[in-house]
Amino acid sequence: MKYCRIFSIALLSLVTSSTLLHGINKVEWDFFTYIQADNNLAPFGVINVKDMQKVGSTSDVNILVQWDKPSDNMTYRYKILQNNMVINSSIKQEMGFFPEKELADSMTWVKNFFPAKRYALILWDHGNGVLDRSKKQPTNSWLSLPGISKKYLRDRGILYDFTQNTFLDNVGLSSACAKIKTTIGQNIDFLGTDACLMAMIEIAYQVKSSVNYLVASQQTEPGLGWPYADVLSSLVGIPTMSTADFSTATVQAYSNFYETGDNADSSYTLSAIDVSKIQAATTTFNAVLKAIAQSQLVDKTTTNAGVKIARANTLAFFINDYIDLIDLYDNLTITFNKISGSRNAKKKGSLRDRMAVAAVAIVTAVAAAKIAAQETIVSSMAGTDYSGKAHGLSIYYPANCLVDASYKKTAFSKQTNWVKVLNSLR
């Protein structure tokens, strides 16, 4: 979900050469961008691939693309070279019929033709976070366009194909990543989403068994998306850098690109998430939910009011149901510290006293959960609109506590008591 900017498009130079397709030995990295551009983002795909050509593949890094373009009924696979690109193969069917299978199959091509020690997979397209699209809504209108009606805020998912009217849902994303892990014989080292609103604890949890690092945005992305030349320059410059360092370098390149100059954007966000630590963040989050549930048994009215105040004061993004998790923890701490301070020592066992004790338990649980959430964030940067408030990891929390049906299908929902607590807050 990228919002469109004024742009100019340069023609791509194109060569075909079987001698440049692949080598025998494993390179350090495959940087593979899966471009689903059969939609209104198509011009930006051209710009981004042109940007990749400024760097080009090296003896240590393969820069690869699978590209679905509008209106030609084909899918193209390229190896990107400096100032040109090589057609590896063309599939006589465009992408979008079976998004999960097509994504998994694309990595079979990468593995067979371009074996590498580490793999970076970038999903390029519209993205709308953890909720899946409601099929009841129109599919030819997008949140990314300025002035779009709020009635279209039901489109969710990632990898939208306008021609086939399909998308990859979150269950499909998890399944595709699991299949890719089997294909390459290891976790995906680096999963990037050049798409909007994907830096969520729920997304990281969906892929926790098959991905090492997730690089994504909490907020909408500018139409130009990632600055690929800058990102790739860091990788080809030091191809042996750790995946954590490459994730950090990607966030820094993105920040540099949108911080100043012609591309300046005060609302940008990008973060790198250590997916191996997402289970601890989820477990401690669930402990917070348990403390809230226990507090509700003491005084549901006061507890619910406190949680709702904290939520109201927390940073929300373009989709108002998506809020910053660490900012939520900070606001829960502030709110329930005030409640705990109302304890009446002279009336031990009174409702106020018991509620104060329950509030202390919430604050204690939140402190541990905040640490765990912070430890998932390798790097996070944001423009001035969100600086100091956007910490790098979002969570789904609808203000009205009405839970979207698609959310209940997510692994995070099934492994925590979040939906139950949300229902209890209504």
How should each PLM-predicted stretch be described?
Residues 1-8:
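Bacterial N-terminal signal peptides that target proteins for export
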Residues 24-117:
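N-terminal extension/subdomain marker
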Residues 30-34, 62-66, 119-123, 189-193, ...:
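Structural recognition of the beta-strand scaffold that forms the well-ordered cores
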Residues 40-45, 72-75, 129-133, 198-203, ...:
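Extracytoplasmic/secreted cell-surface and envelope-processing proteins
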Residues 65-91, 118, 122-167, 219:
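Surface-exposed loop and adjacent secondary-structure segments within mature catalytic domains
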Residues 144-426:
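Terminal, contiguous helix-loop blocks that mediate binding/assembly
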